[in-house]
Swiss-Prot record:
Part of an actin-like archaeal cytoskeleton. Belongs to a conserved five-gene operon within Thermoproteales denoted Arcade (actin-related cytoskeleton in Archaea involved in shape determination). InterPro entries: P-loop_NTPase, Rad50/SbcC_AAA. GO terms for biological process: double-strand break repair. The keyword Cytoplasm applies. This is Arcadin-4. Residues 205-253, 323-412, 450-618 form a coiled coil. Gene3D superfamilies: Helix hairpin bin, P-loop containing nucleotide triphosphate hydrolases. Its main location: cytoplasm. Pfam families: AAA_23 (PF13476).
């Protein structure tokens, strides 16, 4: 592993000029606060990485590494690893220009190639260096004296997972910005609600902005018009002053003339020329025609008012009433058409269902027709099922009698044949003497007399079988026949109902056509005549009448003024002056309105900023992003806790080995580490020889220092850093005797494995190190305007 054999500084931080430091295995720099001890360590870091912690953390700038009053700083290191020698030299100019020279075993490299080769040889980046090589009092102090949270931060820094906290802080900053943006958007949405009516008036926010732009042009144009009218009024006022006395004498006539003429000009300009007085008659005729068409649906008094209207006002009211009545008729017809269409659709649907039912009934009849015809055939033959059953019963009775009779004669014949075959001489029944001839004669008599009985039995049996089949068939077919009759009756009912529904369909269809025709007539009427047309016709008619009256009155007043000595020129000037003054007043009033409107719109535009949908969408996006960041923070915290637990597991074994090699007192035999489940903090426990567990809070400062160093050194060994030196920058900032002694003993243990560089402001600690490590190289750092290095402890 690489060890530093020499450090050279030139115009670096507090060091002016060139300084050289030859290092041994254990090196201790002692000096007061600000003397320049840390500058030596900064020089080592800068030489190796071209960077420095304070610069990276933006506490300082690279240019601050150059001594005040100098233009360039230089740092050089010589590192050895067995036979390998590595020389590194960096120069830094005031303008940030940097030069690097690396010499490895006599091979010189410069620039980017030198940076790459140096990184390869060191095998460590500046982050790992600051965690596991350069151990400052900030790292150890957080573990020794800090709370659980501060201790967690210190250990995280050693593990290298403090970067997660940096990400979390960045995420939190982004969240804060998002919350601010969300609040701004909510205020804009609230402002949108505040100015909703104003925005709606202009058709949305874009319309409001367009109107605001148009207002500026309109205001400028109106201001120019106001200035022009002011000049005109002033000129006319000067011309008017010559005959002002005469004008005042006839002021009342002039005022009346001016009013009449102004009204006449207004009516003529709005009329756009001569008015067709017949337009009102056309509208009236159209209303009368439509009203007569639907007279049966109107109140008779309405038409009478239309016919008898004697003046324009009465006619206007009557026409409006007729129009409203026709509007109601149209609505009633629309409702009636809707009902009739609904009924028509229901009838059509019912007719279709009946067609389907009739078809089903006919199919059922066809299926039952053959069984029914067979049943009818059997009825025709047997008349009825009951009669057939009676005939079957009678045939069975006759068959039974015939079978008994046949059985009797068969028995007699059997006995006679037996007697004949056995040559019996005595009758076995009555005991009378018999002969063979008599017996044979009896057999012949039986055959002659009763031979037909057997034949009759066979015939009766056939008759019974035939009747049984027919009765059974009738019983089976009886249900089908009844079903056929019922189906036929249902079919007849369905056909009758279908005819009635078809009639209703045709009737409803006819009604629909009639209603549509009547509604279409009303639509054609309303397309030509509406309230606006009526009002326009009435107003045009009234305007025409008023124009005639005003023309007549203006001529009369002009004649009176001419007789009073006020001719055309004076009158023209007076009228123009009054018109210009009125226009000027209107322009001023309009300008005030526009300024007021512009002020309101500017305020709304400033507070709202855009359309509500855009604001809502942006707010949703901001809140969604905030939610995702919250989720990311939660996942990062979980990842940090998981990383802590995993790293504790990885380092636990080696951590204890290092601790046991450093801590030789025997009162603590083992240190256990775990991650607290609830908050994710680290828990460190010291275990005594008896197995008792003690939390970090119950340990001494020296014991905590041993744990912190053991953790740092264990991590360093696991990380396989190629640098064989350790730097302790003010590891014990306080002058506690126990802490000094404990750390001096730890240095004794570490000296066998690492090159040590220690900076302290405590002379007592320096003395203890010299006592514990007689071979240690001690340097005194002094400062008198600039820093200087003196070998040995100076008083």
């Amino acid at each position: 592993m690489w060890r530093i054999s020499r450090v050279e500084l030139e115009n670096f931080r507090s060091y002016r000029g060139a300084h050289r430091l030859e290092l041994g295995d254990v090196n201790l720099l002692w000096g007061r606060i600000g003397a320049g001890k840390t500058s030596v360590f900064y020089a080592i870091e800068y030489a190796l990485f071209g960077q420095q912690l304070e610069v990276k953390e933006r506490v300082a700038k690279l240019a601050d590494l150059i001594h005040s009053g100098s233009h360039e700083a230089r740092v050089a290191l010589e590192l050895v690893d067995g036979a390998n020698v590595l020389k590194v030299e960096r120069k830094l100019g005031k303008r940030g220009a940097e030069k690097l020279v690396v010499v490895h075993n006599g091979v010189e490299l410069r620039g980017g190639e030198a940076e790459r080769r140096l990184e390869e040889l060191l095998g460590v980046d500046e982050d790992l260096y600051e965690r596991l090589v350069y151990i400052s009092h900030r790292t150890l102090e957080g573990f020794i004296y800090g709370t659980s949270q501060k201790r967690a931060i210190s250990v995280d820094r050693l593990f290298g997972i403090d970067v997660i906290d940096g990400v979390v802080k960045t995420v939190s900053s982004a969240e804060k910005a998002l919350l601010g943006k969300a609040e701004e958007l909510r205020k804009r949405l609230a402002a949108y609600e505040k100015y909703r009516d104003v925005i709606k008036r202009y058709g949305g926010y874009s319309g409001l902005v367009s109107r605001l732009r148009a207002l500026s042009s309109e205001i400028e144009a109106l201001k120019e018009r106001e200035a022009m009218l002011t000049r005109t009024v002033e000129e006319l006022a000067r011309a008017r002053a010559a005959y002002l006395a005469k004008l005042k004498e006839h002021e009342q006539i002039l005022l009346e003339y001016y009013r009449a003429r102004s009204e006449l000009e207004f009516l003529e300009s709005s009329a756009g020329g001569e008015v067709d007085v017949g337009a009102l008659e056309k509208v009236k005729a159209a209303l009368r025609e439509a009203a007569e068409e639907f007279e049966h649906m109107l109140d008779p008094g309405i038409l009478e008012k239309l016919y008898k209207a004697s003046d324009l006002e009465a006619l206007s009211v009557a026409m409006a009433e007729v129009y409203d009545a026709l509007t109601r008729v149209a609505k009633d017809l629309e409702l009636e058409l809707t009902d009739v269409k609904k009924a028509y659709e229901e009838y059509v649907a019912r007719a279709r269902r009946l067609e389907e039912e009739v078809a089903a009934a006919e199919a059922r009849l066809r299926r039952l027709e053959k069984p029914f015809l067979r049943f009818q055939e059997l009825l025709k033959k047997l008349r009825s099922l009951e009669e057939a059953r009676a005939r079957l019963s009678e045939a069975r009775r006759r068959l039974s009698e015939a079978e008994r009779e046949a059985a009797y004669y068969t028995s007699l014949k059997t006995v006679a044949l037996y007697l004949a075959e056995t040559n019996a001489s005595v009758c076995p029944i009555c005991g009378s003497p018999i002969s063979r001839e008599a017996v044979e004669k009896v057999v012949r008599d039986i055959d002659e007399k009763f031979g037909g009985v057997v034949k009759r039995v066979e015939e009766l049996r056939e008759e019974v079988k035939a009747l049984e089949r027919e009765v059974e068939e009738m019983e089976i077919l009886q249900g089908d026949a009844a079903e056929y009759i019922a189906a036929k009756a249902r079919l007849d009912e369905l056909k009758v109902e279908r005819e009635e529904v078809v009639k209703k369909v045709l009737q409803a269809e006819k009604s629909v056509r009639q209603l549509e025709k009547r509604i279409e007539k009303l639509r054609e009427f309303f397309a030509k005549v509406d309230k606006r047309v009526i009002s326009d016709a009435v107003s045009r008619y009234g305007r025409a009448v008023r124009i005639r009256e005003l023309r007549k009155r203006v001529k009369e007043l002009e004649e009176r003024l001419r007789q009073a000595g006020i001719g055309g020129e004076e009158l023209e000037v007076e009228v123009k002056w009054r018109e210009a003054a009125a226009e000027l007043e209107k322009a001023a009033a309009r300008l005030a309105e526009l300024y007021k409107e512009k002020s309101l719109l500017e305020e709304a535009a400033r507070e709202v900023g855009e359309e509500a949908e855009g604001l809502k969408k942006r707010l949703d996006n901001v809140l969604y992003a905030y939610g995702r960041l919250e989720e990311l923070k939660s996942r990062l915290e979980l990842a940090k806790v998981s990383a802590r637990a995993r790293l504790v597991e990885v380092v636990r074994s080696r951590f204890n080995e290092v601790f046991q090699s450093l801590y030789k007192y025997g009162d603590v035999v083992k240190v256990d580490a775990a991650v607290e489940p609830s908050r994710g903090y680290y828990d460190f426990y010291a275990i005594s020889p008896s197995g008792d567990r003690y939390g970090v809070s119950r340990l001494s400062d020296g014991q905590r220092l041993s744990i912190a160093l053991s953790l740092a050194l264990a991590l360093r060994e696991i990380s396989q850093v190629k640098l064989g030196f350790l730097i302790f920058d003010e590891p014990i900032p306080y002058v506690d005797v126990n802490v000094r002694k404990a750390f001096a003993q730890l240095l004794t243990s570490l000296a066998g494995r690492y090159q040590l560089l220690v900076a302290t402001q405590s002379r007592e600690f320096a003395e203890e190190v010299r006592e514990a490590l007689p071979n240690a190289k001690l340097f005194t750092v002094v400062k008198d305007g600039a820093s200087a290095l003196i070998e040995g402890l100076q008083s």
